[in-house]
Amino acid sequence: MTINFKDYIASVQDYPEPGIIFRDISPLMADGKAYAAATDEIAAYAQDKGVEMIVGPEARGFIVGCPVAYKLGIGFAPARKKGKLPRPTVKASYDLEYGEATLYLHKDAIKPGQRVLVCDDLLATGGTIAATIRLVEQLGGIVVGTAFLIELSDLHGRDKIKDYDMFTLMSYTGA
């Protein structure tokens, strides 16, 4: 059975501000079969890449990455916001519309040479995922791919990660 994943995405007009269409993954997660199918597709991609560790940025990267790691029997490392990780970390910053944000990863999360898949729910401008990739590479990990439920292609996030293989379940154009 083939699933049209877009059937499980709620498109919310003018959220969080006028002119934006918010792509809500909650209905996908609420449907066990659709969520499992999405996880299975990303896991198959990861397995083909020989992935040894999954890294996902806070917070929805956890929703995507953890079940994939579980399915493959490999580890998951969270890239978190400031003050959320208790042991020594590395950090990488990225630009926001107004300002800057920083992600952190435990220094021992990735072993040098480890094959890593970076997962998130959505690729928009690419800043978050590019920072997550930098964290992995600071620790000597090899990013063998990136995976997303959704790509917002008009925002050109793909350009920021053009040197990395990318897998996405669905793509949207428009705000």
Curated annotation (Swiss-Prot):
A cellular-component GO term for this protein: cytoplasm
The record's PROSITE patterns line, in alphabetical order, gives: PUR_PYR_PR_TRANSFER
Q: Which GO terms describe its molecular function?
A: adenine binding; adenine phosphoribosyltransferase activity; AMP binding
Q: What is its EC number?
A: 2.4.2.7
Pathway-wise, it operates in: Purine metabolism; AMP biosynthesis via salvage pathway; AMP from adenine: step 1/1
Top EC class per UniProt?
Answer: transferase
Keyword NAD part of the UniProt annotation: no
The record's listing under InterPro entries reads:
Ade_phspho_trans, PRibTrfase_dom, PRTase-like, UPRTase/APRTase
Top-level lineage group: Bacteria
Q: Which GO BP terms sit in this record?
A: adenine salvage; AMP salvage; purine ribonucleoside salvage
Q: Give the reactions, separated by semicolons, that this protein catalyses.
A: AMP + diphosphate = 5-phospho-alpha-D-ribose 1-diphosphate + adenine
Keywords, ordered alphabetically? Cytoplasm, Glycosyltransferase, Purine salvage, Transferase
SUPFAM superfamilies in the record = PRTase-like
Q: Where in the cell is it found?
A: Cytoplasm
Its assembly, as annotated, is:
Homodimer.
Question: Which family, according to UniProt?
Answer: Belongs to the purine/pyrimidine phosphoribosyltransferase family.
Q: What does this protein do?
A: Catalyzes a salvage reaction resulting in the formation of AMP, that is energically less costly than de novo synthesis.
- Report what the protein is called: Adenine phosphoribosyltransferase
Write the lineage as a comma-separated list. Bacteria, Bacillati, Bacillota, Bacilli, Lactobacillales
